[in-house]
Amino acid sequence: ASSICDGFIIRRHVLMTPFYALRHQVRRLDEELCGNGGKYPTGDVLFSGEGKRIVLGKPIAEGGEGSVFTSHAASASPLVAKLYHPNQRMRWREQKLRLMCSRPIRSPCVAWPREILYDELRRFVGVLMPRADGVPLGAFAFHAELLTNQFPSWTRYDLTRLCLNLSASVHTLHRCGVVLGDLHPGNVLVSPDGSICWVDADSFQVEDYPCSVGTERFRAPELRGNYGDFLRARSHDAYALSVLLFMTLTLGLSPFARQGGEGDMREAARKGALPYPFASYRPPAGFYPPDTPGRYVWSYLPRKLRDALGHNLTCVQRRDLRPRVMPGYLARCLLQYLRDMEPGGGRDHPMYRDLLHDRPCPPHSLLVQMTPNVCTDCGILFREAPDDVARRLRQSHAKSLCKLCIRRRSALNQATRNPTTNH
């Protein structure tokens, strides 16, 4: 058996049987502190559960739960040590990590905990995990300039391959009985070839141990209360993944952003009010996408992918009887999208591989007449039909300008000619 991921196909001979059972009732967590309250600098020695010496290297990062260090240990692969802050060394965390280390998931798409770390008196202080290389998704994928600086050769084909790997990796973890819970762009590292690795796996939801953290933008609208008080379902991951895929495909545009509605995106998300049409859904009156290049990406996506993402973003599970589309189906839609962009496919045209667009998707008969150009105002690559060039010159825009920048200039000129006077 095989899974779509990381170069499209990864063998999952050990991933066919779920490692963890999905539960419906959160366990009562033992909040007793079990550590010694000490802090550990570079050079200190800790011990694994089997008694192996682990020497702390340089600090890599620090967060709300703890600090991450490089480590020196007798291991075939490089490892990092995550040491929890003294107030985070609870008994339930040690118990959860013991469960996770006893049933390790060996997959390149997740940095799964390997061994628990103790001090010389065998008091719990942290966990040992594989070191993952790459760039955090949120550090480059949500702005065209950052993306081209990080990966200069990437096109929409590479961006779609990245989305495929994101979907397939979540599907793989779901098959193992794991719910990610806190699924957001800071928890996934991306390599130049588009392969990905989820980090901070110690916060994943396994069995009846909840994921006690979350990110509001990726929180399913039907969820209420504190994150640690309930168990999440795979459907909640599907919602967060759909938000992440939309933002990645549009280079940072929130799915619920709209013209004139900057302050109420969370309310729109709660109601499932998307400003983009799909299938039989039409946006509410007055809901228009923001006037940015990312808005047009939606019209270039294949219909099945649009329908799946749109359904996941607009349905609220308490009032919609249709379940959300799962990551495995999203991965299949994205794989077909990739194949369509390859030579001989239905989307085998350079325009489909542009990162951003200044117009809705044109009919195929018009594509062959369009020539590439670079906007002198915003810098995006856009394409012009012969009629577009003539119209731009008639409007006295001698420089190459995309349609969005022509509209902005026209609006600015209009405002200059008709200034508003306050009496």
Which residues make up each language-model segment?
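ATP-binding glycine-rich phosphate-binding loop
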Residues: 32-74
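ATP-binding glycine-rich loop module of kinase domains
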Residues: 57, 64-107, 111, 147-152
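Conserved structural core of kinase catalytic domains
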Residues: 111-158
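Catalytic-loop of the protein kinase fold
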Residues: 170, 174-191
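Activation segment/activation loop of eukaryotic-type protein kinase catalytic domains
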Residues: 189-218
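Conserved C-lobe activation region of Hanks-type protein kinase-like domains
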Residues: 248-299
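Regulatory extensions appended to serine/threonine kinase catalytic cores
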Residues: 342-374
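Short linker/helix segments within small regulatory modules
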Residues: 386-400
